[in-house]
């Protein structure tokens, strides 16, 4: 979109470069989460990732500089989507074998159900308050996730039951 319409005013070429850079950051975020969480723990890694995502999204949505967007984009994707790598490991390690598959499916799909509303919510808010304000709500969701994870037990090194 043009700047006048609330967009960032990038050409199709520049937007493609931005998306590719973000996809690369995403991939590294997914991969690195496993290595980092094996070293320092699932809980600390997850909380760090989502708090970094919250901060970076606020920085990302407050700039219109194409170079800054290109530099910040991969880091937003690294932390914002890299945190999802933790769900499989943590849910496998928290639930006993007898209910593991059901519990993983339930928790995963509750998240999918909640996130199904995201395009509508972000679109509606963007229409009334602009894209930056709408996407900033994502920061709030990441902060709430960090708070919620305070009560999730650390599972690094835990034997499956």
What are these regions (language model features)?
Residues 1-161:
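Transmembrane-helix signature of 12-pass secondary carriers
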